[in-house]
Amino acid sequence: MKVLGKELLDNLLGDAKASPRRRAHLNLHKTFDDKVQRLFIALSKGSYVEPHYHELPHQWEMFVVINGVIRVTVYNSDGSKLKELLVGDGEECRAIEFQPFDIHSVECISDDALMLEVKEGAFDPDFAKVLLTSG
């Protein structure tokens, strides 16, 4: 049994604040070969994950926001915005799931945020994500 307590998660939030990317990850799975990849992602205000998508057929992913608020933007293939929504504390949406090829970005808009990401493995770093590039 794994117990993931407040101190561990507070430390992860501290790591995010100290990081140049303003985010930190804690993998809960044992290896990249595990069939289910689970990780906590701590974000500090201003952390921005650029528009990207996952190209392999098994690369769906789900974010469950535990605390804080993130802005999720979904894009067309030409880079135009399709939808923008707030996910987390005080919002109608608390979790979001993306399918392969869903182009999306994530930005932390609260002082900090903590989310659980769940996705199918295995994880191959060579196919982690494809950044949306402007023409």
Task: Name each region found by the language model.
Residues H58-D78:
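Glycine- and acidic-residue-biased ligand/ion/polar-headgroup-sensing regions
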Residues P51, V72-V74, I96-F98, H104-I109, ...:
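Short beta-strand His + acidic residue motifs that chelate non-heme Fe in jelly-roll/DSBH
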Residues M1-Q37, E84-D89:
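A short, N-terminal "cap"/entry segment at the start of jelly-roll beta-barrel domains
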Residues F40-Q59:
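Conserved short histidine dyad/triad with adjacent acidic residue
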Residues V3, S80, S105-G135:
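Double-stranded beta-helix
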Residues F40-I41, Q59-V65, I96, V106:
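His/acidic/aromatic-lined binding-pocket segments of jelly-roll/cupin-type domains
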Residues M62, N76-H104:
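Short acidic-glycine-tyrosine-enriched beta hairpin
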